[in-house]
Amino acid sequence: MAKAERSKYFNFYILNIKLRKRTNQKNLAPEDYVRVMRKVHREKIHEESSPNKHCIFRFMFEEKAKNEVEYLSGTFAQFTFIQNERWFNLKSLDMDEEFKVPEGLFPDAKITDYVFIPKAHRFCYRTSADFNISPYAIRKFLEKALDKACRPDEFVQVDVESSKESIEAILSAREIKKLMIDINYSNVDIGSDLKKFVEEDIKASNTSRFQVVATQKPDVSIDVEQSTILSGALQSAISDGEAEAVIIDENNRTKRIKTSQFPRKESIYGVKSRFNQLVFEKIMRIFRNNGN
């Protein structure tokens, strides 16, 4: 008799993928995201995720509803990328001119599950003791691989979702000495009016990235809430960029807070075979009102 699956918690990171047109401000459709993702998988495109490490999609399956792709899912791998160069032999203590790694074989592979939701343009991957790779490494892979699969008039921007606690830590500081924000704009995401104001302004100006640096007056904290631009940009940094602040904490110590130190990690509870569906449902609840 087959052993029943046990329900447990599964954790995952979230990356925000935005496919853009170079020549206009049009938001590309979910099917465009599917097209680009499929091409990366079909052509076995592998790209660097960190020094000497590459990633590649192993499998990619579709889940459809009403003739639309709800999500893509499968597994991807990170491996050590070795190029045949000069090898040193520890036995002979000399260069081995004959040795070559068999073509197409790479060591130290780690494999995990992923889910990509085109309507929310979010890429999620399961993290575990066996696959605890930084989402910033996965972002590097996705940006390079997806860029290769784009049409000539398209480009890709990828951001790691940060936790709201990172912004709250900045805003609750006793004193904000300096604030640096680097953002782009979202693709039909839900958000506050301030966030929408800043992002629509960036979009209207044909700007791909927007950077702002705010420095305090002597001995006076930056008041973020009194600035429409700073408030909106800081909220945008959660999903569409990064922020960094130099603050004075309650113990009068100078600290540096970066949103990149607080990647958003979500979890679902259920059996492993339902991981993809549960992630899809949660992402749609978070980033799309009523799944629209």
Please place each PLM-identified region on the residue numbering:
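Glycine-rich, often proline-containing surface loops adjacent to acidic residues and nearby aromatics
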Residues: 114-126
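Short, compositionally biased low-complexity segments enriched in polar/charged residues
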Residues: 95-117
